[in-house]
Curated annotation (Swiss-Prot):
Its cofactor is Mn(2+). It is an enzyme of class 4 (lyase). Mn(2+) 2 binds at residues 62, 106. Keywords: Antiviral defense, Cytoplasm, Lyase, Manganese, Metal-binding, Nucleotide-binding. Belongs to the adenylyl cyclase class-4/guanylyl cyclase family. Pyrimidine cyclase subfamily. Mn(2+) 1 binds at residues 62, 106. Its EC number is 4.6.1.2, 4.6.1.26. This is Uridylate cyclase. Pycsar (pyrimidine cyclase system for antiphage resistance) provides immunity against bacteriophage. The pyrimidine cyclase (PycC) synthesizes cyclic nucleotides in response to infection; these serve as specific second messenger signals. The signals activate the adjacent effector, leading to bacterial cell death and abortive phage infection. A clade D Pycsar system.
Amino acid sequence: MSDEDLFLTALLDSLGKEVNTVLNNSPIKVEEKDGDFKAEDIPSPSSDTWVKLPEVVAVVCDLKGSTHLGTGKHDTSTARIYKSGVEGAVRVFHEFGANFIDIQGDGGFGLFWGERAHERALCAGVTIRTFSEEFVERLEKRWPEGLPETGYKVGIHAARTLVKRIGTKREISEQEAVWAGRPVNYAAKCAQSADRHQVIITQAVWDKMKDNDFIAFSCDCGDGPTANLWTDVTVDRLPEEDRDAVVLNSPWCKTCGPAFCEAIMAGEKKRDIPSAVRTGINRMKMQKALEAKRLRDSSRNSALRGVR
């Protein structure tokens, strides 16, 4: 047997033993932390401890068509596009106080927990969507021909998660924080399902936001506040029971956006909304609830017919 064969055989044998040890004998400790937990305190690979955070809001941004952005351009031009786009999104996460930021190729994600995590996350998501449109306008001016359709797609989800740094011990460059749970996974699937300049948030997040008038209703510009700012959407990439979501197509209003963002971040929730508009959104909620009940009843009846 050659040295290469011996190396591979030994490596696979060692990996198998390590997996068996971790699955059956390795001590694992889970510590629940509150909103004051700091990302720099995430346990290292040498620790047996995982940290559990009861609720983390993940905002994932994904740049549409990024694989084609370098086609026909010089390396320096491609680098400028990535630098300006990705750094712009990362700065948004930073400015809205993301507790953890991870850059992944043409995008990344920000994680929010603690005080007003949902509000900070939503404002960050809408701001990235707004930045996306302005970013693309600048790209189109710089390269009026041959630019692929691009722009940020944003997804948001919230749930509990476990976190720990995993990788090669004593090799910092080979270690990363692993977020085990649904927040990043679901938010990424929402972003993948969105089109450019869209924000998709899961029903779990919308349930926390729908009673905030600064979020649920459009601003007073034009025809005044309306209840059609968000529309229902189904995220087929998610498990069937979690596919309900809503999508936002609009950026921050140039006139009202700064004040609305400030109000949301300050925890304000109520505006002077005409009763007819408020009744309209309540009617839509009722129609959605009735439709969901109809689907549940239909599924239950089909199941009963199947066992007769």
